[in-house]
Regions:
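Conserved active-site tyrosine of GNAT-family acetyltransferases
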Residues: 26-31, 54, 105
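Short Gly/charged-rich anion-binding patches and loops
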Residues: 25-26, 100
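N-terminal beta-strand motif that seeds the catalytic metal site of vicinal oxygen chelate
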Residues: 1-25, 86-95, 144-145
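Short secondary-structure junctions
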Residues: 35-43, 110-117
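Vicinal oxygen chelate
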Residues: 2-8, 52-53, 93, 99-145
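Charged surface patches that recognize polyanionic ligands
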Residues: 70-77, 83-90, 95, 105
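Conserved short beta-strand elements that form part of the metal-binding/catalytic scaffold
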Residues: 37-82, 122-145
Length: 145
């Protein structure tokens, strides 16, 4: 194992993101069908997205399901829905230090979407690995607030 490999420390799966056209209908569907509980909702004005975090099972602290709906037609989620339709949009991992993890991944030749981490849901700091460098999967790195 190289030094760069040793520096990447993924702590757990944080959430799986699903793009939806209607956030309220999707929350209702996942609650009624699978018994998931909505534990957080917010609108990210910078990204143009409405989002909800749904808890899976009795442990609200475990991995979550994130529902993402466009808040405006020019958002990345709106473009994703236009291109691919509703469905899986991202896989997110919890990391201790998003900057250090990003630097280690860049050292391996992977591209990140942002030069510097950005603030996101509930004050977390995030960055994304470009899907073309991660087998077609948009990988999100989440450093909790």
């Amino acid at each position: 194992m190289t030094d760069a490999l040793a520096q990447v420390e993924l702590l757990r799966i944080d959430h799986v993101g699903i793009a939806v056209a209607d956030l309220d209908k999707a929350i209702e569907f996942y609650a009624a069908t699978f018994g998931l509980r909505c534990v957080h909702q917010e609108t990210n004005e910078e990204q143009g997205v409405r989002e909800a975090m749904l808890a899976v099972g009795p442990d609200a602290g475990g991995p979550r399901l994130q529902l993402l709906a466009p808040a405006r037609p020019d958002s990345a989620i709106a473009k994703f829905l236009d291109r691919s339709g509703p469905g899986l949009q991202q896989l997110a991992y919890t990391v201790r230090d998003v900057e250090a993890t990003g630097a280690a991944l860049r050292a391996r030749g992977l591209r990140l979407l942002y030069d510097q981490p950005r603030r996101d849901t509930a004050g977390s700091r995030i960055n994304f690995v470009h899907p073309k460098d991660a087998g077609g999967v948009l990988v999100e790195l989440v450093e909790p607030a």
